[in-house]
Amino acid sequence: MFQGASSLSLDAKGRLSVPTRHRDALTAQAGGQLTLTKHPDGCLMVFPRPEWEKFRERIAQLPMSAQWWKRIFLGNAMDVEMDGTGRVLVSPELREAAGLSKDAILLGMGNHFELWDKATYEAKEAAAMQAEMPDVFKDFSF
């Protein structure tokens, strides 16, 4: 399970360094094999390959009415591999789609990660914190 937020910098070639605390798990779980794709909220999803395969199967089974979402998730998916130093190359197309330039945030979301442009994430998080909490949390004990 992946959790927590990490501030990252993409280098000039569009590579990010996976935080050390996640490298061993990604190597053990997926041999360093990852899949990146678009997320409807404007970030990228980063899956260990076995989790991606499960997600891909679920998406592929959706009805024809979801064809465009299949295209968005599957058609934009890029398989990548961590190099020996834990770096991952994010394609120019996916960097552009998520508005990634240099400063980024990697969020552990359980079985996958979200990769956000830092400024975009901070703005969306601030807006969410100012908005009313969703009903699903009304009876949740903190």
Curated annotation (Swiss-Prot):
Forms oligomers. Pfam families: MraZ (PF02381). One of its GO terms (biological process) is negative regulation of DNA-templated transcription initiation. PROSITE patterns: SPOVT_ABRB (PS51740). CDD domains: MraZ_C, MraZ_N. The keyword Transcription regulation applies. It is found in: Cytoplasm, Nucleoid. This is Transcriptional regulator MraZ. One of its GO terms (molecular function) is DNA-binding transcription factor activity. Belongs to the MraZ family. GO terms for cellular component: cytoplasm; nucleoid. It comes from the Bacteria.
